[in-house]
Swiss-Prot record:
Positions annotated to bind GTP: 23-28, 140-143
Organism field: Phytoplasma australiense
GO biological process: positive regulation of translation
Claim: ATP-binding is one of the keywords in the record: no
Topology relative to the membrane: Peripheral membrane protein
Full protein name: Elongation factor 4
């Protein structure tokens, strides 16, 4: 290995991310960059090339971060090695963005020239500033008839405090402005620092499981070099392996002789144990280890919890394996075994938000062939008992009895909503109905406003975002950050079917909303549970007190149909016998809850 050559090459490396609000055309712009630089042959080019999951292409969103190496011949006749790390735009996946930015020196901030700055644009800019990145603003979709470049440039100056003249006008659709972006990357983003002669320090920013190669970590080399045959040490767990292969993504894997400072790539070391590789860990040399690991990432804590149960009981182990493999690249996913009398064995699983929960559920189904039932999502409550001890409760069934509770605190969020001025009233009404308190209203320009609300997190995890979108005809954007815990009047509500508590349907509700919530759930269940041969009462209860009830009438079989003539005593006898049979059936009968009923309850709230 020629150290002088490595240092020369390092001066020509540029690492950058593309960050944007969801739907601002980030993946399309990435496609054009790959196409114009010849990284991907036009014949194999497909839309959203970096969105490797079918799920990402179908939904038109980026879920996972992806890395790719680009070779670019600049106008100064030098060839530059660029590493583009694509990032998601949805609020639930902001941890993926922070992981990407930790592996970069610069960020391209994509702003839709028609929609302007949205809430997630702001959040991403703050993340980039936190990571001391050079920000290159790009106005995308300038070819649209609705594009308003002067207005959006004004927003860049007023809201982001970035010189609007620095913004590049571009179109991911036509490829206009892409060369300007690449030239700006060359001149403005600094090459990576790092000493190739220092002990190896490589940051793991992603990983996945390959059935042939084992666990494959994606890494960014900070210091030192790594090549085939090296003995490496994972600093968190002190596990030692021998490197089998190193390489880069193009976007498929391409094997290389070595990786040096600034390189973004992968390594394989026949790692069979999933638990040995964790995102944010540092890989170093076993013979000449680094003194301390890299700072890694801010740990993302799960904020939404629900039960995941396999529909087929014998798929429990398959579900466990699926969750373990998904956790490899998704360190925010947490799970522990739990059991339910209604649903059997499953897992209590933690997520970063409802979209995150939905995506994991869909990936388990598609990638591992396991169909699951999800219970109602819940947040973490702080419950204080009479001794003043704090208990963390993420499952309503774990809530102590009311006599043992001194107070319950729930998490609140600071929500930022950007919407057209004409929808302020509707947004405020929705937020007030969700127990929100208005903090601030700021006018961005003549048309748009930024509204800050303090909201209970439990009220927003159901359908707040969907309702916000429909009330504002899709124009509102929503972002949030966790605020603090506050005391609330909360208690557990049980749902009873045929007199039996269904633990999977229990939830923690605010006392003022208990009746309406209970009534809605009972009505929803009534329309989804099929009729039986016996009557089924559906009840919502706070402790021993029933607050709402619906009844599913029994199916009626005409037992007198075979009678001819008018023998009324025979008729009465048969009806009496049927009545006794139904009574017995009711005491022994078990009511099965269809998955549709669970899903309907989630959307009904």
């Amino acid at each position: 290995m020629n150290i002088t050559k490595i240092k020369e090459r390092q001066k020509r490396i540029r690492n950058f991310s593309i960050i944007a609000h969801i739907d601002h055309g980030k993946s399309t712009l990435a496609d054009r960059i790959l196409e114009i630089t010849g990284t991907i042959d036009k014949r194999v080019m497909q839309t959203q090339i970096l969105d490797s999951m079918d799920l990402e292409r179908e939904r038109g969103i980026t879920i996972k971060l992806n890395a790719v190496q680009i070779l670019y011949q600049a106008q100064n006749k030098q060839q530059y090695i660029m590493h583009l790390i694509d990032t998601p735009g949805h609020v639930d996946f902001s941890y993926e963005v922070s992981r990407s930015l930790a592996a970069c020196e610069g960020a391209i901030l994509v702003i839709d020239a028609a929609q302007g700055i949205q809430s997630q644009t702001l959040a991403n800019v703050y993340l980039a500033i936190e990571n001391n990145l050079t920000i290159i603003p790009v106005l995308n979709k300038v070819d649209l008839p609705s594009a308003d470049v002067p207005r959006v440039k004004g927003e860049i100056k007023d809201i982001l405090n970035i010189d609007p003249e620095m913004a590049i006008s571009a179109s991911g659709k036509t490829g206009a402005g892409v060369i300007d972006i690449l030239e700006r990357i060359v001149t403005q983003i600094s090459p990576p620092k790092g000493d190739p002669e220092a002990p190896l320090q490589a940051l793991i920013f992603d990983s996945y499981f390959d059935p042939y190669k084992g666990v494959v970590p994606s890494i960014r080399i900070i210091n030192g070099t790594v090549k085939k045959g090296d003995q490496i040490l994972f600093m968190a767990g002190k596990h030692v392996y021998e490197v089998v292969e190193v390489g880069v993504y193009n976007p498929k894997q391409i094997s290389k002789d070595y990786l040096a400072p600034g390189d973004v790539g992968y390594l394989t070391a026949a790692i069979k144990s999933i638990n040995h590789v964790s995102v944010g860990d540092t890989i170093t040399s076993n013979h000449k280890p680094a003194i301390q690991p890299l700072p890694g990432y801010k740990k993302m804590n799960s904020v939404v919890f629900c039960g995941l149960y396999p529909i087929e009981i014998n798929k429990y182990e398959a579900l466990k394996e699926a969750l373990e493999k998904l956790k490899l690249s998704d360190s925010s996913l947490v799970f522990e075994p739990e059991s339910s009398s209604a649903l059997g064995l499953g897992f209590r699983t933690g997520f970063l938000g409802l979209l995150h929960m939905e995506i994991i559920q869909e990936r388990i189904s598609r990638e591992f062939g396991v169909e699951v039932i999800t219970t109602a999502p819940s947040v973490i409550y702080h419950v204080y008992n009479l001794k003043g001890e704090k208990i963390l409760v993420d499952n309503p069934s774990k809530l102590p009895s009311p006599q043992m509770i001194e107070r319950i605190e729930e998490p609140f969020i600071k929500a930022t909503i950007i919407c057209p001025e004409i929808y302020i009233g509707k947004v405020m009404e929705l937020s007030q109905n969700k127990r929100g308190s208005l903090q601030n209203i700021e006018y961005i320009d003549q048309q748009r406003t930024k509204i800050n609300y303090l909201l209970p997190f439990s009220e927003t995890i159901y359908n707040y975002f969907d309702k916000l979108k429909s009330l504002t005809k899709g124009y509102a954007s929503f972002d949030y950050e966790m605020e603090n815990y506050r005391v609330s009047k909360l208690q557990k509500m049980d749902i009873l079917l045929n007199g039996e508590v269904v633990d999977a349907l229990s939830l923690i509700v605010h006392k003022d909303f208990a009746y309406s919530r209970g009534k809605t759930i009972c009505e929803t269940l009534k329309s989804f549970i099929p009729k039986q041969m016996f009557e089924i009462p559906i009840q919502a209860a706070l402790g021993k007190k029933i607050i709402a009830r619906e009844t599913i009438k029994a199916m009626r079989k005409d037992v007198t149909a075979k009678l001819y003539g008018g023998d009324v005593t025979r008729k009465k006898k048969l009806l009496e016998k049927q009545k006794k049979g139904k009574k017995k059936m009711k005491t022994l009968g078990k009511v099965d809850l269809p998955q549709k009923a669970f899903l309907a309850i989630l959307s009904a709230k």
